[in-house]
Amino acid sequence: IEYICTDDIINGSTEEFDSTVRRVIFVVPEGRSSLSYLAESYKTDKTAVSFFRLVKKMIENEMDGCDISVMIVTHSAFNVTGCDSIDPFGSDVIGMALSVRKEISNWQITCFDTDTFTEDTVRAMEAINRYSSGASALYAFRNGEVYIRKLEKTDVPDKSSIAPFNEESVVLIIGGGSGIGALTAANSDDR
């Protein structure tokens, strides 16, 4: 059984939402990036709350032990190609979804950020859902192409090639009062 999330989650009317559900699709509304909308939206946007309520409802219904596919669909939440115009709404839901993915290993959570909703987009989403091994959690669809977020190996230069602090400069450390921030501050002070 597939369940497509709408505003009924916000309103709490999800009685039919139980452990027979095997696939959940959560779609973040698109077309909300106008300046006037942005000004008001911080007080009224319920998308992240809606996703939180969805996860809470699934856990209350003891679905956290079930193998469930959860797909989050956003609209241009990230600049993938370097020249995308973005709509930041949905990026908070993606962040929350990636956290839930780490916490509840039975759920295969996949985030899919698209520039347009077309038949090609739907086909790409279905293909990813069908063939994905779950190795990646974030996909983007731009101009008919699928992009996959992945970590790349990089070489770290040896210490001798890193430019040292300038003895006469002023260093401002923002945040990080413990851990790395404290060590950096102590190192700077020693110099």
Q: How should each PLM-predicted stretch be described?
A:
Residues I1-V21, R32:
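A short, well-structured beta->alpha microelement
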Residues I9-S13, R53-K57, L183:
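Short alpha-helical segments and helix-capping/turn motifs at coil-helix boundaries
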Residues S19-T20, F165-V170:
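A short, charged/proline- and glycine-enriched loop
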Residues I25-S33, H75:
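Conserved NAD(P)H cofactor-binding loop of Rossmann-fold oxidoreductase domains
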Residues L172-G176:
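Conserved N-terminal Rossmann-fold NAD(P)-binding element of oxidoreductases
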